[in-house]
């Protein structure tokens, strides 16, 4: 079991739910006039029961004032055009096939259309869904750990987990919300061993078709079990595919079974070539710090894992090899999709997130065994 399910409850208000509820109502009224208060309070009292609720309320205001941009703007424009149609008519609309025919975007647009056709409201609701699923997928599974006293290395890794996820990802609309659905159920599956969570993690496909890759990785991880030579062989092959610039993902997307499911931009050769040229230009002339920061983060977290392995031993690693194996598969899948800038960027960030979660759990498990020298070394590596 990855996490001890016993939560160290230091929240005195949790004994009196009525008091907590009244506090939430009062703070919500205050946030109506000063939304930033909710963010500050949710961060200051992140261990308290009301913190996630305040954070979600703040996300509504954040999305409202941020307004749709990038992918979210495209979906809003499509929503604006079909808002007065029935659910069936929206499903059959040509734009639905073009921008995503998964269950989540279709139902989201339909139910928002029943309330209001307003771009600020559309963005606010998208941000609320994204934030709620982030809490479900990342924050809640780690709650039994961050409720405990944490050492400096644990704090830094916990912050690494939280800040790996960036605020503007809600503009992706479909992908990251679905990714957090998978993360939430899969972490629960690893922790409890319950097969039902593994099945439920497949719900991520209802958000974005590319998340099928996560389901494939989960099943492959289940089948491979402890055959780590195969894991590392897959990783080596993925690097060969990456540096040879083989369009592995787009070639798979050409299969007939994806014809009515994936977006046209993934199957149209002219669009694929244009996107490929754009990706090369971005990687060559784009902001190198932004492009390399996840790579630097991976090397940092792998260095911490190496230190833990050498200084403390491999007991935690042996108990949680399934988690480690999934991290290896995620890195491999990201490499397989390197030619596609969007696919690689998304799945590499997911791999970074899972590696940080794995390392944070490891440090929390053995922090009492860490010497001052080891803590200092991990702290320096994590900061760098």
Language model features with spans:
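Membrane-interfacial loop-to-transmembrane alpha-helix junctions, especially the N-terminal start
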Residues: 48-53, 231, 315-327, 371-379
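Alpha-helical transmembrane segments and terminal signal-anchor/GPI-anchor hydrophobic tails
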Residues: 68, 73-76, 82-83, 88, ...
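Short hydrophobic/aromatic helix or loop-helix immediately within or flanking a transmembrane segment
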Residues: 73-80, 92-117
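Transmembrane-helix motifs of polytopic, lipid-linked glycan transferases
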Residues: 125-145
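Transmembrane-helix signature of polytopic, membrane-embedded enzymes
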Residues: 138-161
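Membrane-interface alpha helices of multi-pass inner-membrane proteins
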Residues: 165, 196-220
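Membrane-interface transmembrane helices that cradle and orient dolichyl/undecaprenyl
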Residues: 179-196
């Amino acid at each position: 079991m990855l996490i001890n399910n016993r939560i160290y409850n230091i929240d005195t208000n949790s004994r009196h739910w009525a008091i907590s509820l009244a506090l939430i109502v009062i703070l919500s009224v205050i946030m109506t006039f000063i939304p930033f208060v909710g963010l500050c309070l949710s961060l200051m009292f992140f261990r308290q029961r009301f913190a996630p609720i305040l954070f979600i309320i703040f996300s509504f205001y954040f999305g409202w004032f941020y307004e749709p941009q990038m992918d979210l703007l495209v979906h809003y424009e499509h929503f604006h055009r079909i808002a007065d149609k029935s659910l069936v008519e929206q499903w059959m609309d040509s734009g639905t096939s073009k921008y995503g025919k998964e269950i989540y975007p279709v139902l989201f647009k339909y139910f928002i259309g029943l309330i209001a056709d307003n771009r600020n409201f559309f963005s606010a609701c998208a941000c609320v869904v994204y934030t709620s699923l982030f809490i479900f997928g990342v924050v809640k599974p780690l709650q039994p750990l961050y409720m405990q006293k944490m050492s400096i290395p644990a704090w830094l890794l916990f912050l690494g987990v939280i800040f790996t996820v960036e605020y503007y990802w809600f503009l992706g609309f479909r992908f990251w919300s679905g990714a957090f659905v998978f993360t939430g159920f899969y972490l629960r599956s690893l922790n409890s061993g319950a097969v039902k969570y593994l099945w439920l993690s497949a719900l991520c496909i209802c958000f974005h078709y590319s998340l099928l890759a996560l389901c494939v990785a989960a099943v492959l991880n289940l089948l491979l079990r402890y055959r780590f030579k195969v894991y590392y062989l897959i990783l080596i092959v993925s690097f060969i595919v990456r540096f040879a610039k083989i369009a592995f993902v787009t070639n798979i997307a050409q299969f007939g079974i994806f014809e009515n499911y994936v977006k046209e931009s993934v199957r149209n050769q002219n669009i694929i070539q244009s996107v490929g040229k754009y990706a090369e230009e971005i990687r060559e002339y784009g902001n190198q710090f932004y492009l390399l920061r996840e790579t630097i983060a991976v090397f940092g977290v792998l260095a911490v894992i190496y230190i833990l392995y050498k200084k403390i031993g491999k007991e935690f690693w042996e108990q949680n090899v399934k988690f480690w194996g999934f991290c290896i598969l995620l890195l491999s899948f990201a490499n397989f999709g390197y030619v596609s800038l969007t696919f690689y960027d998304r799945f590499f960030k997911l791999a970074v997130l899972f590696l940080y979660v794995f390392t944070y759990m490891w440090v929390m498990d053995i922090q009492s065994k860490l010497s001052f020298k080891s803590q200092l070394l991990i702290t320096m590596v994590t900061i760098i």
